[in-house]
């Protein structure tokens, strides 16, 4: 990373960006849930949320505190941010993929009629897990505003997709589940892309 990549840390500025993003993201999430509950039958909605909660709970500790360490140590070692993100991803994948397979098999044994929903719920949780590291790195690089935008992009894709399907009268849960996965993917790609742009092209991906 070049010495000019990123910006200096400013707690007040970063807190303002993150606060605005959180308020926007929570607002969009609430709108999304209202749309979802309006579009789906109560039992269908309940089962989808249950599947999501199972994987979210299983992955809750799988960030292993690594993004937190990245956000803490990154400002003092900015040239190590990109290699650190790749290391975090490799470590998380090593732990998360086996857990996803085990939890997925257990959930499928209880809900064998919805394999697609189980797969999507696992994918959404994995994508959210993968987003933590680049967002922490953006904050460490002094770009909390870009971290904030990545969150808003994720929620905007989700809420916009929900609204589109609701206006079309869609009552099946699968399209809404795919929209949630698309939002999670957008958040991950956006945060990773913004980090790459912030750090510049002069770092080489570690082998």
Q: Where are the predicted features?
A:
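Hydrophobic alpha-helical transmembrane segments
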Residues: 115-122, 149-199
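Residue-level recognition of pore/gate-forming positions within transmembrane alpha-helices
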Residues: 22, 26, 53-56, 96, ...
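Alpha-helical transmembrane segments of multi-pass membrane proteins
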Residues: 57, 61, 94-101, 105, ...
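Signature of the first transmembrane helix
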Residues: 10-67
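Membrane-interface junctions at transmembrane-helix termini in multi-pass inner-membrane proteins
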Residues: 73, 127-150
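Helix-loop junctions and terminal segments of transmembrane helices
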Residues: 62-78
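Hydrophobic faces of transmembrane alpha-helices in multi-pass small-molecule transporters and flippases
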Residues: 8-31, 89, 118-122, 145-149, ...
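Membrane-interface alpha-helices at helix entry/exit sites of multi-pass transporters
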Residues: 47, 79-91
């Amino acid at each position: 990373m070049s010495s000019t990549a990123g910006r200096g840390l400013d707690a007040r500025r970063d807190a303002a960006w993150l606060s605005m993003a959180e308020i926007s993201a929570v607002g969009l999430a609430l709108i999304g849930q209202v749309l979802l509950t309006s579009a789906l039958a109560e039992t269908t909605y309940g089962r989808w949320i249950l599947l999501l909660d199972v994987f979210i709970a299983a992955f809750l500790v799988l960030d292993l505190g690594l993004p937190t360490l990245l956000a803490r140590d990154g400002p003092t070692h900015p040239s190590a941010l990109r290699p650190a993100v790749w290391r975090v991803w490799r470590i998380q994948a090593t732990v998360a993929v086996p857990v996803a397979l085990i939890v997925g098999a257990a959930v499928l044994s209880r809900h064998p009629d919805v394999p697609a929903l189980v797969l999507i719920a696992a994918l959404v949780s994995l994508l959210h897990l993968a987003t933590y590291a680049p967002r922490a790195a953006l904050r460490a690089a002094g770009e909390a505003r870009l971290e904030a935008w990545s969150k808003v992009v994720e929620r905007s894709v989700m809420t916009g997709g929900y609204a589109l399907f609701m206006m079309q009268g869609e009552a099946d849960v699968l399209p809404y589940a795919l929209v949630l996965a698309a939002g999670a993917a957008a958040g991950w790609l956006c945060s990773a892309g913004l980090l790459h742009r912030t750090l510049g092209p002069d770092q080489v991906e570690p082998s």
